[in-house]
A protein has these predicted regions:
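Binuclear metal-dependent hydrolase catalytic cores
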Residues: 1-206, 272-299
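Cap/insert and terminal regions of metallo-dependent hydrolase folds
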Residues: 210-298
């Protein structure tokens, strides 16, 4: 059980490669205005690391809880920048959306959080589906079987919980409803690659999607807050475009009160796109915003 409000802190709002792109910065004749803008203070919201968020709330036992959604390649840098600013310290659980590098390749860096209390090492609960578990075990075998560790032997400790796509699960008193979505397809077979979003409290989180089945839309409908994928202006085989994200948000009945688009590549200027979506505000249109790293919202 929880008491008081729940906050969502965006630790990252970019795609897998992040923004800026280093080759854009080192180009002898640079032309990428978005990447170049990150070198100046006024372009700070164009710095976008792998999409990730922290669900922060006060438990009824009087201790704050932090549930991390995804832990990608840039998690360490996100934590270094945002943890102190938002008075975060521990990680009580990790929920993983899918088996791509930008969702779980930062897990090795969680060893430090397992050893915050050196007298009482902590095993972080991890919630993921079976396909993601299988891929993780191949990528990081020592995270699943500590006997496979090498070097000095300092490794993170995790306790794994397998999610079923059609069943709710509870993390630290918060009920999560899985939201299965298509995130591109397998190149070898053409079958859809599945990613999970999650509905909890009055928020639905869908960070990686190319299409959303009607059965999943039924679970999203009624959310007051929607976090939705939107890679760039043009269509893409594994992500919603910004226009598709807006269209999907407006297709919901009832519409969410607020929507935040995430997952941007380096062709998207935060300030330009945010001005565009703000211009859509009306009584019949949800407030859609371009999310940015470090942003904190109440849900």
């Amino acid at each position: 059980m929880t008491t008081g409000s729940t906050d969502l802190i965006f630790l990252g709002t970019g795609t897998s490669s992040g923004v800026p792109s280093v080759p854009c910065l080192t180009d002898p004749n640079p032309t990428c205005k978005v990447c170049l803008s990150t070198l100046e203070p006024e372009g700070v919201k164009n710095i976008k690391r792998n999409t990730s968020a922290m669900v922060h709330f006060m438990h009824e036992d009087g201790r704050e809880r932090n549930i991390l959604i995804d832990c990608g390649k840039s998690f360490y840098e996100s934590a270094r920048q945002w943890y102190r600013l938002h008075n975060l310290r521990c990680i009580d659980a990790l929920v993983i959306t899918h088996a791509h590098a930008d969702a779980y390749y930062g897990m090795d860096d969680l060893r430090s959080w397992c050893l915050i209390d050196k007298e009482k090492p902590y095993s972080i609960p991890v919630y993921l589906d079976q396909g993601t578990m299988d891929t993780l075990a191949q990528t990081f075998p020592y995270m699943v079987d500590s006997s496979k560790a090498t070097g000095g032997g300092d490794i993170p400790s995790f306790t794994y919980h397998i999610i079923e796509h059609d069943k709710d699960f509870v993390v630290e008193g918060v009920t999560f409803t899985p939201l299965p979505v298509h995130h591109g397809k397998f190149m070898s077979t053409g079958e859809p690659f599945w990613s999970l979003g999650f509905r909890f409290r009055d928020l639905s989180w869908v960070s990686d999607c190319s299409s959303i089945p009607e059965s999943t839309t039924a679970k999203i409908t009624g959310s007051k807050v929607l976090v939705i994928d939107g890679l760039k202006e043009k269509t893409h085989p594994s992500h919603f475009s910004i226009s598709e994200a807006i269209e999907y948000t407006n297709s919901l009945d009832p519409k969410p009160e607020r929507a935040f688009i995430v997952g941007f590549c380096h062709t998207v200027d935060h300030y330009t796109e945010d001005a565009k979506v703000r211009a859509l505000d009306s009584e019949s249109h949800p407030k859609i915003r371009i999310a940015y790293d470090g942003q904190r919202i109440s849900i």
